[in-house]
Every structure is written in structure tokens, then in C-alpha cells.
Amino acid sequence: MNRDHLVKESRKWVEDAIISEVQREQLLERYPKKQNKPVLLTFAALFIGLAFLTFVASNWSYLTDLGRMVILLTSLTVFYLCGDWVYRKKSKPVGISLIMIALLVFGSSIFLVGQMYHYTSYSAFPFFLWSIVAFGLFLIFKDHSFFYATLVIMTVGQLYSGFVFQHFHIWLGLLFILGLGWFVLSSRKVTQLAAFGVSYTLHAVILVFSEGMPYYWLIAFFLLLYVVEDFLLEKGSVRVFKTLSILSVFTMLVLQVFFLGNEYVGELTESSLYFFLAWAILFFFSVVRSAMSSTNYYWIDLLLFVPVFRFESGDMLSLLILFLYSLLWLISGYQQEVSRWVNKGTVAFLLTTFIAYFQLAWDFMDRSLFFLIGGVLLFALSYFLEKKRRTIHKGGGEK
């Protein structure tokens, strides 16, 4: 039943003494207000903002400096004030969309004014200013649209800093961790945790490679994300950070299989006391937390974080760890009859088998024969594993 219609009708029922006011409130509690997500309005704001930027850019050279400043300041003020008024008096989603346009205008104004007065920034500082305003709007209006806007601005700014200037912008990083990080750990909403985790992974990659750090520091950063979920997020929540950290380090091991034997990569693997100290502390906490868990099988995930780059055959050891990881999850899933573990092990095993086959057979086997045998092998493995998975799924549970 439509809640708005129920509100009107129930008021009449109270007036006609059909129900009491208490009963009316209990009835309305069964039909809570729907939280409408203004997706269309958000895209509308985005397109209007892009239309503004396109118009200004196409006519920018024909305007005087005074005319340019008037257009930017007027647009920014009008959109923000109208958005604030509409938000408070009329419609919150429409108001948010107008304020979002103002945020886009503000960001573009930073770069346009810099171009107008021939100011060149050799860092991501303009993105930092833009992020501060976006984060401030998020704190004021408490709307998730501004959370994602802030996250996108920070991530794009950090990517820009890394690719263009080969530098990690420390202030963007601090605002990301202390600002958005604090919020996602407090809210614990899956979509926001996932978005933050993806951005964290990109930040870690940019930090390591733009600052000339050895690539293996990524293991510590991914392990940190894994540990954060163990100690700062409540039990029973969705394993968002852990899943992202596992996917990231799994991908890293795959790359090690192909490139760790390369001479150039070998030069990057000089031992680092600080790395092993950080890794040992994080790994210790992970092991302790895993031992304290009611489901002790999650120690299998920690195998992926073992640093094998210091060994001469690090590429083969990386492949061995991938096989061991997938087989242990398969065996554990079959023993405990947990279909989710079987699914995880199945996917990991098929990927690892294909990687091993590709690594070992690509150089000497005829290409057509290579793909034919590989396809038949994967088909046979998938058939066998799917048959076992269905058997488990019929009586298996989730852990």
C-alpha cells in the first residue's frame, strides 16, 4: 500500500473513531518511508554540469577576464543558493542535484581561473582543494552522493598526481584515510566499504610506484586492509575489505608468476628491513585473529600474503602458493560441506591451472594445439569440479 495514501486515510479513520492514534502510528510503522535514491537526478546534475563546462570551454577565448569571472562566480552562487533553498524548502533530491552542479562548477573554476591567470600547479593541489569542498558538503548535508563525489575526486586527483608528476600527494592521502576512512568504518555500509576499498587499492599502487618503493610493499598495504576488517569491523559483516585484499594479492601473485624471474624485476627485490618488520607485525595480528575466530579455516587466505620474492625461484613458488590456496579451499569446502568455499576454491584452481599451463606451454607448443589442449583441460576440470560443487550445494551451508 502507498504510504502517503495510508497517512491521509488513517487520519480520517482516527477522526471517525475507527482506530486510535496509537493504532495509527503502529500501522504506519509497518510501512516505513522509502529511501529514494536520486540516481536520475544525480545523472541529470552531471550532464547539466558537463553542458556548462562545454559551453564555457567553447566560448572561453571570446570572453574577457572580467566576463569569465562573472560567469564562474554567478553560476557557482546561483546553483548553490538555489540548491540549498530547494533542499530545505521543497525537495531534498533536487536540492542535492543542484548543489552537485555547484560542486562541478567549483572544480572546473579552479582550473579555468588558473589557466586565465597563467598559474601552473605542479601537483594535485587543485584536486585537494576540490576534495575539501566536496567533503565539507558531505559533512553538512550527510548525503551519500557527496561521499562518492569526494571519493572520485580524490582518486582521480591521486591518479593524476601519480601519472603526470610521479608523486603521491600526501594531503589527498591523509584526507582520504582520516576523512572518508573514518566515515566508512563508522557507517559500515557495503557499497561505501567496497568503493573505499577499491580506491584504497589504487592509492596503494600509486604510492608504491610513484615514490619508487619496491613493488613488494603492496603485500603490506593489502595485508593492512585485511587486518583492518578483522579489528575494526564487527563480526558477521560482509567481508568487503578482505575480499578486495585477497583479490589484489592474488593478482599480484599471478604477475609474479610471469615476471618475477625477469632480471629487471629481480633488481627491485632487495631486502627491506622496514618491509619485513611491517609485514611481520601485520601477519602476526592476522594469525592471532584467525586463531581466535570460530571459523579457523580463514588462515588459508594468509598463504597469499607470504613474501616469496626473496627466493631464487620466486615465480614457481608463487604458482605453488596459488595451487595450495585453491586446493586447501576445495578440500575444506568438501570436508565442511560449505558451498561458498568450494566455489572460491574452484574459481581459484581453474585460474591457477590456466596460468600454469600458459606459463609452461606457451613458448614451445604450437598455438592452435596450445589453445585446443588448454580448452579441453579446463573443460574437463570445470565439469569435474562443478559436479562436486553441486553435490556439496545440495546439503552444504554457509560459513
Listing of model-derived features with the role each one plays in the protein:
Residues M1-K399:
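Alpha-helical multi-pass membrane segments and their bilayer interfacial helix-loop junctions
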